[in-house]
Amino acid sequence: MSTNEEFAGKVALVTGSSSGIGEETARRLSALGATVVVNSAQSVEAGEAVAAALPGTAVYIRADISNQDEAHGLIDATVERFGQLDFLINNAGWTTEVPHDQLDDLTDEIFRKTFDVNVFGTWWLTKRAIPHLRKSDDPNIVNITSIAGVRPVGSSMAYSMTKAALNQMTLLLAKSYGPIRVNAVAPGLVATPWTKDWDALH
């Protein structure tokens, strides 16, 4: 394993990392020498398999970040296990495909669930993590947002709105919480198990 001095000895929590972007992020961080916490709300076996396959030190911790207690518990468990937190990668998200011109299909239940995971979950994790990140000599928060947060695209209006909220959250945190580095990555549509059936969006 070829490590990188910047990541050696660091602890990274990657939410929603049992597949897709989160999994690849966890793999890359581990390959660079970071200790990685893999997380998912479901797909427990997949998450455990990802952690087991990583080249460096890694564990899997199940938590549903749309539940405040579980989100807080995920941060607490990470710090209790490894004594520190240096990188928080807020990747976990949820959506379902609802065409933008079919508002009647965008139910309050869908709207709330999308915000609970994508916005509230990210907020709860970040707020809980900041006191620990302040103790790090290289603290980082990376929010995985989406091109849907800045353009009229995306799987649903609710999803796009949550990603716009995360973009603004990123700017405000970056301005207010230095020297913690806070950045957002806003990819377009990525081929993952989650999007494989979204023919209309491809």
Predicted region positions:
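A glycine/serine/threonine-rich, flexible loop-to-helix segment
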Residues: 155-158, 188-202
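Alpha-helical segment proximal to the catalytic Tyr-Lys
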Residues: 131, 174-178
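Active-site helix of classical SDR
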Residues: 126, 162
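Conserved glycine-rich cofactor-binding loop
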Residues: 11, 18-19
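Substrate-binding pocket helix/loop in short-chain dehydrogenase/reductase
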Residues: 99-103, 107-112
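Conserved glycine-rich Rossmann-like NAD(P)H-binding loop of the short-chain dehydrogenase/reductase
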Residues: 32-49
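Residue(s) in the substrate-gating loop at a strand-loop-helix junction
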Residues: 146
